[in-house]
Amino acid sequence: MSRVAKAPVVIPAGVEVKLNGQVISIKGKNGELTRTVHNAVEVKQEANALTFAPREGFANAWAQAGTTRALLNAMVVGVTEGFTKKLQLVGVGYRAAVKGNVVNLALGFSHPVDHQLPAGITAECPSQTEIVLKGADKQVIGQVAADLRAYRRPEPYKGKGVRYADEVVRTKEAKKK
């Protein structure tokens, strides 16, 4: 049985929550996020908190309730504080630049790589080898970071490539003759 679902999600001041059946909208200073909740979960709004309860007749209702609580908590944090993800480019000649909502990457290919950012996500480059992604939706931030990393994943011998700032790349030893 999930213990996560038993804790309510506290709604801070300045955040507006709308319940419309199974569709929940959360609006704050960083924008508005909407999510459809699984049928096995019943969400109730009480004063300044959201509570979660499983519905009868579903085998995985407690698990779904815990997942829903975690997702809605991430939405509340996203519209109040926002999320950031940092990427590093390691390698000779690997550079990044941001022009509007397009991230331009030079990753050792014969052509530059242009990645279009989705709505609600902003990027900035404090240096040529760093990218900082910011936005309200935790899932979209993670997906964009994974897409950028997928262009040139860190290779295991020298560690060159695009990596998360907190990622530790284990390097192998080169083959000896």
From Swiss-Prot:
Pfam family name, one: Ribosomal_L6
Keywords, ordered alphabetically: Ribonucleoprotein, Ribosomal protein, RNA-binding, rRNA-binding
GO cellular component: cytosolic large ribosomal subunit
rRNA-binding is among the record's keywords: yes
GO biological process, one term: cytoplasmic translation
SUPFAM superfamilies: Ribosomal protein L6
Domain of life where this protein originates: Bacteria
HAMAP family associated with the record: Ribosomal_uL6_B (MF_01365_B)
Assembly notes: Part of the 50S ribosomal subunit.
Role: This protein binds to the 23S rRNA, and is important in its secondary structure. It is located near the subunit interface in the base of the L7/L12 stalk, and near the tRNA binding site of the peptidyltransferase center.
Family: Belongs to the universal ribosomal protein uL6 family.
Protein known as: Large ribosomal subunit protein uL6
Species this chain originates from: Serratia proteamaculans (strain 568)
Gene: rplF
